[in-house]
């Protein structure tokens, strides 16, 4: 129910459009930073109640005070407030927010597992109405090729212009939202169509959601069912309005692009200049979306500027320079192989991602558009030579030498993911995360080598389900890598933005769940890996078996933690949510996090979620752990009581099948390109050292007690000093080794001295 930085108008709009009587949310106060506002829908209007923060307590301007916001909300759920006019303010159901901090992914997944996935996905489906034109796809010559949006489609340049539909291909540019886009997003329950005024018929359909009979029956009543049956399913009036709006925005962006090109400010591109309109159209689309997110506010300059060349990840102007661009396309048909390779050459794509098998369940999902290893094949003007092919448990990597119209060859890397099941989604998100890391590593290495690779081309069969799932996961992970675990992520809104560029992306509820599980798995891995590095520093040795493979067959390459994660302190994470910052501490935090706009945002001191933030994904084990040792398997029962989603426990050396009971990291050994291990020898040495220290302390205490009465004070001082030294000595022991820690020296004094360890047999 906590929506962070949300304005009062946005809160009213959300609750009135999507909520029902009794729906409530809590947001940060816009007028008084540090305070919060409780917004409740009562009798089809919204009541705002100020929540004050003073003397380290929360109150609503009188009455009882509470240590946390959660306690205040629970209290007023049981004891409703009464307005001065006599209206009772009932807090019946929270209006859930989908925008969360990355570190809070476990709590969000746990909440959705209880029944919220279906509701959230259905809300996404209802918000995905057509707001952009598809006129090109409806033409007779293109009807069998594509049904997707016009403003982001890829246009082929090197074709016969006389043939109708020759420049048309089933492919769309997908751009990662800039940081400005994400920062200006309002709560994800807001409809994407808020700027398009609906006709009376659609307005009537919208009001049916607030029918009290439907709410009472928990289903559509007969009256609403009859009324909805008479309404148009695809309103022409709304479509005309949205088409004219999108045309207006596209014309603005294209004129801006033309001005930039005339001024000579655009970057040079390796592809045809005809794609300028496509890039400008997509920027115009994102400007429309951003305006919808921000209300009437103008979008940041980085999102309104158009690029003067084709839309590639390394060629976008402004803030977009940091981010990748993808091409989502359909799997090749028998008559589209030449068009596919034409697009690959035109866009200077060097990495192709294929997420489907050629045949699944007896049906052809994608025609083979490449030759066998060592063979060369011609596809129209395209000549493709497969020079190498390597396979892993999850995917096959092929290397092609590709030329178009006998021009100089380019090296293409074809990543063919082959373990996606015919039904549903993979049981282990780790295999997908490993795959994405290898793909991104290759794309980055090409950019560092100065080859200026174009967009990554991703396709499955239809180019929307698995393709959208892979792209959305990669977008979210890139955001976390850039901004750290304190960044705000919104999976639902990210999918909405991707669907605005190619409709239907992330097609099923199972795929929607999988996006959450994959992001959760990745965040758990970052925390576990960071914690492993901290433990290695505390114990004073390096984890030599944690390896990070950058590509196939190269285990010597290590990838460091992202800077946003390596600077993270797990200890500070625990205290950051425990109590609010003072003014001095807040100023220090702002200074320490300069350049990170998310770090300075105020958050309510919510109570620790404790062991309730368990990982609810099922059986995440497998290829996400690349083991380099096969000596032991650890079973750990780590319990976490803090809200920073950190684990306490060791991992497994020979596989990722460690049992984590009550462990917030789920399968605690799972981590990206690495896994933990149980150092039994080191643990035994540490235990023996602790036993020896305890025996020494006990002997010293016994000698002190046997001394003269005059030395009682001295003995007490020595005992206290020994206790303090012991406490300091064990202060930095990791939680998963607390079981090896001995009791306080004061309690050991009365215990009998432990016998020395047996002498090992002499070797002969």
Swiss-Prot record:
GO terms for cellular component: cytoplasm. It catalyses: O-phospho-L-tyrosyl-[protein] + H2O = L-tyrosyl-[protein] + phosphate. Substrate binds at residues 422, 460-466, 507. Residues 255-273, 612-666 have a biased composition (Low complexity). The active site is at residue 460. Its EC number is 3.1.3.48. Keywords: Cytoplasm, Developmental protein, Hydrolase, Protein phosphatase, SH2 domain. Belongs to the protein-tyrosine phosphatase family. Non-receptor class subfamily. This is Tyrosine-protein phosphatase corkscrew. The lineage of its organism: Eukaryota, Metazoa, Ecdysozoa, Arthropoda, Hexapoda. The gene is csw.
């Amino acid at each position: 129910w906590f929506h962070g930085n949300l304005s009062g108008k946005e809160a009213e709009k959300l609750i009135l459009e999507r909520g029902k009587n009794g729906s409530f949310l809590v947001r940060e106060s816009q007028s008084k930073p540090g305070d919060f506002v409780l917004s409740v829908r009562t009798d089809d209007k919204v009541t705002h109640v100020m929540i004050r923060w003073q003397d380290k307590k929360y109150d609503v301007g009188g009455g009882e005070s509470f240590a946390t916001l959660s306690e205040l909300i629970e209290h007023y759920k049981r004891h409703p407030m009464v307005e001065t006019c006599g209206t009772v303010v009932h807090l019946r159901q929270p209006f859930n927010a989908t925008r969360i901090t990355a570190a809070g992914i476990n709590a969000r997944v746990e909440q959705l597992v209880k029944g919220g996935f279906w509701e959230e996905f259905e809300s996404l489906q209802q918000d995905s109405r057509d707001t952009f034109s598809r006129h090109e796809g409806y033409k007779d010559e293109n009807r069998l090729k594509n049904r997707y949006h016009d403003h982001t489609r890829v246009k082929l340049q090197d074709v016969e212009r006389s043939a109708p539909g020759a420049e048309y291909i089933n492919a769309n540019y997908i751009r990662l939202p800039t940081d400005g886009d994400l920062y200006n997003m309002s709560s994800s329950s807001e409809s994407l169509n808020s700027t398009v005024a609906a006709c009376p018929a659609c307005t009537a359909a919208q009001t049916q959601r607030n029918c009290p009979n439907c709410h009472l029956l928990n289903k559509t009543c007969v009256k609403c069912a009859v009324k909805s049956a008479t309404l148009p399913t695809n309103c022409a009036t709304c479509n005309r309005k949205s088409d004219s709006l999108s045309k207006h925005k596209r014309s603005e962006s294209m004129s801006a692009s033309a001005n930039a090109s005339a001024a000579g400010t655009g970057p040079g591109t390796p592809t045809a200049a005809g794609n300028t309109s496509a890039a400008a159209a997509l920027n115009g689309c994102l400007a429309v979306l951003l305006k919808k997110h921000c209300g009437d506010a103008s979008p940041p300059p980085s999102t309104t500027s158009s690029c003067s060349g084709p839309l590639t990840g390394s060629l976008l102007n402004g803030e977009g320079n940091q981010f990748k661009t993808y091409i989502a396309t359909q799997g090749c048909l028998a008559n589209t192989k030449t068009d596919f390779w034409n697009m690959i050459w035109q866009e200077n794509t060097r990495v192709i991602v294929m997420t489907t098998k050629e045949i699944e369940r007896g049906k052809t999902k994608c025609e083979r558009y490449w030759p066998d290893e060592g063979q060369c094949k011609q596809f129209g003007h395209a000549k493709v030579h497969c020079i190498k092919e390597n396979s892993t448990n999850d995917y096959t990597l092929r290397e092609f030498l590709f030329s178009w119209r006998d021009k100089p060859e380019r090296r293409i890397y074809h990543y063919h993911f082959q373990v996606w099941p015919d039904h549903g989604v993979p049981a282990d998100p780790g295999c997908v995360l490993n795959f994405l890391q290898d793909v991104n590593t290759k794309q980055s290495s090409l950019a560092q080598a100065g080859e200026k690779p174009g967009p990554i081309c991703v396709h499955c069969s239809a180019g929307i389900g698995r393709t959208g799932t892979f792209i959305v996961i990669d977008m979210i992970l890139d955001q976390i890598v850039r901004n750290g675990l304190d960044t705000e992520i919104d999976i639902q809104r990210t999918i909405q933005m991707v669907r605005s560029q190619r409709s239907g992306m992330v097609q099923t509820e199972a795929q929607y769940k999988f996006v959450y599980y994959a992001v959760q798995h990745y965040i758990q891995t970052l925390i576990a890996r960071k914690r492993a590095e901290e433990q290695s520093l505390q114990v004073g040795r390096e984890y030599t078996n944690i390896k990070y493979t950058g590509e196939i067959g190269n285990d010597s390459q290590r990838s460091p933690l992202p800077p946003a994660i390596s600077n993270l302190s797990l200890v500070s994470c625990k205290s950051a949510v425990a109590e609010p910052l003072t003014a001095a501490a807040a100023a220090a935090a702002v200074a320490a996090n300069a350049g990170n706009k998310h770090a300075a945002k105020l958050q309510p001191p919510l109570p620790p979620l404790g062991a309730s933030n368990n990982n609810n994904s099922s059986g995440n084990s497998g290829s996400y752990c690349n083991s380099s040792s096969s000596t032991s398997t650890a079973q750990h029962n780590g319990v976490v009581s803090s809200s920073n989603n950190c684990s306490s426990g060791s991992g497994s050396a020979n596989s990722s099948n460690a049992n984590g009971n009550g462990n917030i990291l789920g399968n605690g050994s799972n981590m990206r390109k690495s896994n933990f291990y149980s150092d039994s020898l080191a643990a035994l040495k540490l235990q023996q050292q602790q036993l020896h220290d305890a025996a020494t302390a006990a002997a010293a205490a016994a000698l002190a007690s046997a001394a003269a009465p005059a030395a009682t004070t001295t003995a007490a001082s020595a005992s206290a000093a020994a206790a303090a030294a012991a406490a300091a000595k064990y202060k930095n022991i990791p939680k998963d080794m607390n079981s090896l820690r001995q009791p306080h020296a004061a309690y050991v004094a009365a215990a009998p001295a432990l016998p020395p360890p047996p002498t090992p047999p002499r070797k002969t």
